[in-house]
Amino acid sequence: MTDKVRLTTMVQAAGUAAKLGPAGLEEAIHDITRSDDPNLIVGVEGAEDAGIYRIGDNLALVETTDIITPLVDDPFTFGRIAAANALSDVYAMGGRPVTAMNLAFFPACSLPTKVLAAILAGGSDALKEAGACLVGGHTVEDNELKFGLAVTGLIDPARVVRNCTARPGDLIVITKPLGTGIVSTAIKAEMVEPVLEAEATRWMTILNAQAAELMVACRATAATDVTGFGFIGHACEMALGAKVTFRIELARVPVIPGVPALIDDGLVPAGCYRNRQHYEQHVSGKSGDPLLPLFDPQTSGGLLITFAPDDARTFLSRAGEEGLFAACIGEVEPAGGTPLVFV
């Protein structure tokens, strides 16, 4: 039975914690230059979540891909989380996913094919909910299991939400709590309570579709999704890109209940420490273990959004009415000192 397979024991690191760290990635892509195609709206020059390519006066493609290792043991659930994680980059830009292709790296010598079938079914389940069409895919026989999607979306070029356009005076909102990387590490070690595992899994399987639609309707000034570089890494990208400072109230940043206890037990992914090593120079006001959940690599994390104050209040009100989680956690200020200040 596929439900008895422990996928997390077959990989070195779980989910987005397996991604190349920010320092190594910056070095690897340093010499890649932007295309001079006039229809390219968003390319490789920044830290954006997806590329944007104009195909008409009021229409552009949103292009992204994302592949992760298992962070839960159930194959179907892993497939759904991996798909939700890949779709999220389109949502973060304000786009609507329309097509996707499976990307599967599978250890055929150590796992039965029915495990891959269950993973693909989980991915298809997320795509169906998103209203996107699966149009193909590619498989590679590999020693370590990985799955993800290449996703194409559509967007009006005038309504693209970038991650580098926050403005002083904006309020900062997040739409999911933090801590999934830490919980995934505990799952791999078989040191997590079932209730906590179920709660983290629930958050990771939720699509950012509804939050993104509301974000666009409420005129977000900037947005990203919180993934492998953790909350602090992605918030730094936003603040540095916009040349502003994010003032964050640490007590208001939502963390999945039970995560601090896992930190006390030493169940922290290596990616969390890599993120801290790279980004702590950009942080002031607070330090130490209270910030570890904010360095934690997230998989299928929430949207981190900035709004003008009135629009933020509208978003929070409507999110509550629609049953969406959302928390206002800080304010954008003119640049001064470090990009992130915690109070």
From Swiss-Prot:
State the InterPro entries in the record.
PurM-like_C_dom, PurM-like_C_sf, PurM-like_N, PurM-like_N_sf, SelD_I, SPS/SelD
Which reaction equations make up its catalytic activity? hydrogenselenide + ATP + H2O = selenophosphate + AMP + phosphate + 2 H(+)
User: Where along the chain is ATP bound?
Assistant: K19, G46, A47, E48, D66, D89, G137, H138, T139
Q: Name one GO molecular function term.
A: magnesium ion binding
A Pfam short name: AIRS_C
The site feature described as Important for catalytic activity is recorded at K19
List, separated by semicolons, the cofactors it needs. Mg(2+)
UniProt-annotated catalytic positions: U16
- Family membership noted in the UniProt record: Belongs to the selenophosphate synthase 1 family. Class I subfamily.
Q: Could you list this entry's UniProt keywords, alphabetically sorted.
A: ATP-binding, Kinase, Magnesium, Metal-binding, Nucleotide-binding, Selenium, Selenocysteine, Transferase
State what protein this is by name.
Selenide, water dikinase
